[in-house]
Amino acid sequence: LPHAELQPDHPDSHPDSHPGTTSVPHRDSRADLAHPMVGSPKSSRAGHAAPASDEPLAERAAQRIAEESQAVVEEITTVIEGKPEVARIAVLVLLAGGHLLIEDIPGVGKTMLAKCLAAALGARQHRIQFTPDLLPGDVTGASVFNQATSEFEFRPGAVFTQVLLADEINRASPKTQSALLEAMEERQVTVDGTTYPLSEPFMVVATANPVEMEGTYRLPEAQRDRFLAQTTMGYPIAGAEVRMLDAQTGPVREGDREVVDSVRARTTPEAMAQHIRDVRRVYASPPLLEYVVRLAEATRTHPQVTLGASPRAAVHLVRAAKAHATMDGRTFVEPQDVRAMIMPVWRHRLHLTPQALSRGAGAGDLLDQVLRTTPVS
């Protein structure tokens, strides 16, 4: 694998902007990699009726998921002006059954995005303000002695909800940050030897300030790896900021306390839980899975990388690609889905060497290079 010297990160760069990422021979076209009739589970089971949950996703179901997801995105953007791509990432991460990390400076709408997502889903939500004195039991729950019954009773923590907003997660100690690990990966919490399952769906939307800011701790690698995707908000464009100022400083409807109260539920948690299960049925061909493995291997063996994409990162990329395909109304994954999702899914997991960082290179530069030099098939 050739390794050209990395150049400084360009925030406007996109994997699809590099011609090398789409240059493949005609015989190895997307149809060979993506079409569900090529080696699909359904064709290999001819004559054997499989359970409904094992069947490939029907086109009608995919269209329904796409329409409902778009309605949620549009509802979020009624408050988060000018950021449809960020709202889309948030909904996509939910459909992929993952968790979202939003890293940016204070005051750009990270918390508002999480609140709008929960409101548009009609989901229960809890918010934890992470501070240095926050304890793990505040997150997961604890056993409390009940004097009336002379027994210990479990008092659930904030994770017992459907959308958990972990606000400024990197202001708490690493011990408290790690309290979320089991909940994020296993969808359960173990306290005093007893395991308690979490709700469906369950999604953590964590906000984090840049680590250079005062009073922040770096998120442990194990926790960063459990976030399916990472995104940033950025400053709004001028026109969107004007509309935001008008909405947030003008009168509110009677009964509303803040602007997020105007967000309407466009779906239900039960429907989204079913959509999450349906997305897992989107077809990804063996050649496409091999392409993802080659991409992961390229990051692991790159001389300017100290920590490449983990097997969990590869799993998350395939799940995100499936959700991306479904939001486009398709029932199978194409290479373009993988390329579209590799940045938000892998960028926050990679560690570059000090030499690469000293030249101003970033993880996005490395992923651009990997996409250019890794053949699709």
Q: Predicted segments — roles?
A:
Residues 3, 24, 35-59, 63, ...:
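C-terminal engagement/docking regions of AAA+ P-loop ATPases
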Residues 120-148:
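AAA+/P-loop NTPase substrate/partner-engagement loops
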Residues 146-151, 172-176, 184-267, 272-282, ...:
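Canonical AAA+ ATPase core
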Residues 104, 167-168, 179:
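Walker B catalytic acidic pair
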Residues 105, 139, 207:
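P-loop (Walker A) phosphate-binding loop of NTP-binding proteins
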Residues 89-92, 145-165:
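Conserved alpha-helical scaffold flanking the Walker A/P-loop in AAA+ ATPase domains
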Residues 94-131:
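Walker A/P-loop
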Residues 61-105:
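Pre-Walker A (pre-P-loop) alpha-helix and adjacent loop at the N terminus of AAA/AAA+ ATPase modules
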